[in-house]
Amino acid sequence: MSGLLVSLQGAVAQGVLWGIMVLGVYITFRLMNIADMTVDGSFALGACVCAVLVVNKGVNPVLALLVAVAAGVVAGAVTGILHTVFEIPAILAGILTQISLWSINLRIMGGKSNLPLLKVKTLISGLAASFGMTQAQASMIVGIVLALSLIHISEPTRPY
């Protein structure tokens, strides 16, 4: 039974991460009605920037997260410039940016496809250590809080 709970915790932790990317795809495809594939490359760009800053440079995880968000914003801006200034169709601009980001991500990572985060302090490990819980439990709590926050924010306001 404990093996099932550990697997469930891992699945929820990964689901939270992939859910963020799915929200980006949903916003561009459904709400903005633009076929934009940049989110695929920019999601990985943020992860690469954050991992390199935390592992190789020893930067605080919160600051690394903010820099990663800024890198994603720059990637989105490149897509926007390709679409508006150079008048490339949105789907093609997104695909061009996505393909470019694959190479850029490998360059950022120093030619490696991954970096081990096992011995590095992250946001989740800091939270887990502060409250005396495992990292999987901290991931689940963060995921639940984020999900409830997004549900609360996305609900339409009703006049009373």
Task: State where each predicted segment sits.
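Single conserved hydrophobic/aromatic residue that forms the stacking wall/gate
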Residues: I151-Y160
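Extracellular/periplasmic helix-loop junction at the C-terminal end of a transmembrane helix
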Residues: L101-S130
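Hydrophobic core segments of alpha-helical transmembrane domains in multi-pass membrane transport
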Residues: A47-A51, W102, G143-I151
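Short, non-helical or kinked segments that cap or interrupt transmembrane helices
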Residues: R30-L45, L82-L96
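Membrane-interface helix caps of multi-pass small-molecule transporters
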Residues: V52, I81-V85, R107-I108
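Loop-to-helix entry region at the N-terminal start of transmembrane alpha-helices
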Residues: V6-Q14, S130-L150
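Membrane-interfacial amphipathic/re-entrant helices at transmembrane-helix boundaries
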Residues: M1-M21, V49, N56-L63
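Alpha-helical transmembrane segments within multi-pass membrane transporters and channels
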Residues: G58-I99, L148
